[in-house]
Amino acid sequence: MMRLKKWARELAIFIVVLAAFSWGMDQWRKPQPPEISHLPDITLVNGQTVSLAALSAEKPLLIYFWATWCGVCKLTSPMVEELHKDGVNVLSIAIRSGDDERLMRGMAAKGLTFPVVNDQLGRLGAEWDIGATPTFVILDKGNMISSTSGWSSRWGIKTRMWWAGL
C-alpha cells in the first residue's frame, strides 16, 4: 500500500512538471502576431481573398502554419482536415512549400481540402514570428487567444478552440 502511494505521488509530480514544462515551451515559442486589424487581406491558392479579422469575428479561427517538407506536419495535417470537415473555422498557411500548383497537387494526393495560403517565401511566417512548424494559432475577434507549436492531438486543438469560444 505504501509503495502504491509513493508511485501515485511520483506520477502526480511527474505530470505537474510535464505540464509546467509544456506550458513554458509554449510561452517561449509563442509567436508575436502582427496587429490583426492592420493586416492586409490575404489570398488563398484558389484566388479567394480573406480577412483574418473577418474570419475570426463570428467564431474562433484556427490558423495552422505548416509545410509540405515538415515531418510532424504529415501527422497533424490529417487531424486539421478532420477538424475542418467537422466545421471548425480553419485557415492554413503553407510555409516555403513550392508553387501553388505543386502545393495543391500534394494536398489533393493526401485528401486535404482545408483553405490554404501559399507562403512561398516565408514572409507571413516571419511576420508572425513562426519559429517551428507546425504552429497552431487561435484567433477570436481578431485577438490571439492561444498558440502551440509541434504535435498536438485533435482533442487538444478542439479543447483550445472550445476555450477560445467561451
Segments from the language model and where they lie:
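Hydrophobic beta-strand anchors of alpha/beta hydrolase catalytic cores
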Residues: 62-63, 90, 136
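N-terminal "domain-start" segment that seeds a small globular fold
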Residues: 21-53
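Short acidic-hydrophobic, aromatic-tinged amphipathic segments that line or gate anion-handling sites
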Residues: 43, 115-119
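Hydrophobic membrane-insertion alpha-helices, especially the h-region
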Residues: 8-24
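Short, Lys/Arg-rich N-terminal segment immediately upstream of the first membrane anchor
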Residues: 1-7
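Thiol/disulfide oxidoreductase modules built on the thioredoxin-like
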Residues: 108-112, 120-166
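Short active-site neighborhood of thiol/selenol oxidoreductases, capturing the structured segment around
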Residues: 51-74
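Structural microenvironment flanking redox-active thiols in thiol-disulfide oxidoreductases
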Residues: 74-110, 120-126
